[in-house]
Amino acid sequence: MSFETSKTFPAESRYTSNVNAGAYRAYELESNPRAASKTLRMLEAAASEFYAATADTPELLREAYRLRHQVYCVERGFEVSDSGLECDEYDDHAPHVVVRRRYDDEVVGTVRLVLPQAAKPGFGLPIHSLCASDLGHRVALRSTGEVSRFAVSKERRGLSSEASQLLRLALVQGLVRMSAEHGITHWCAVMERSLLRLLRSSAINFEPVGPMVEHHGMRQPSVCNVSSVLQQMRVEQRIIWDFVTLGGTLWRDHLTTATHERRGFKPAYAA
């Protein structure tokens, strides 16, 4: 599967039922095989409803901005725009991922990765306009991207908890892909604690880099090392790691697909 060709991940990246018995035998070695099997079934079932794509056309970007307006302006009380779109100056240097519903292609989730701009103060990352942090002393800003506008609308979310989790994981998969493509080694963010907790449940752990700040609610400036996060995820949440990295193919300094297959688990994506 490749963003370079189709710019989407429909059939070839979806979790489908082509997982053989060897997958389950491999996961019997996990510390909690029952939970592992439940996670696998959840991903298989929920991924039949959604797919992720890069927002690489004006039309898809407008859909992302429209969803952001629904989430941040209508639902969370940001200033409402007459255009019905929520966008800002950071979008000019931020690739986006959207998650779409398969049966009608409606955009139900989006996230952007604000890329560093060496010629701008603070490398052009929004975190520096919102708070004082020691981010620049912790990581190399030239390879740090800011995770921002992580949005799934309540209005469009008449979803099971499993589907909601898949939406988040599909967005994280997009972040991993974009980070690999743009040489990003660290993510920073200014997030609500509730979102940080949800990410932590999938072994995505951010560390604070400053005190809580008020920005349309209290938020925590945070940072993480992408490689470290994925290494921890591979140990603690192997099935989720396989989904988020496409069996290790999206982040090459981890376990390779070939090694993964020798354990008896093949990435569960239709070719």
Task: Provide a role label for each language-model segment.
Residues 121-226:
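Acyl-donor binding region in acyl/amide transferases
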Residues 210-262:
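Accessory, usually C-terminal, subdomains that scaffold auxiliary metal cofactors
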Residues 33-40, 134-145, 230-233:
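Acyltransferase donor/substrate-recognition loop-hinge adjacent to the catalytic core
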Residues 109, 125, 255-258:
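Structured alpha-helical
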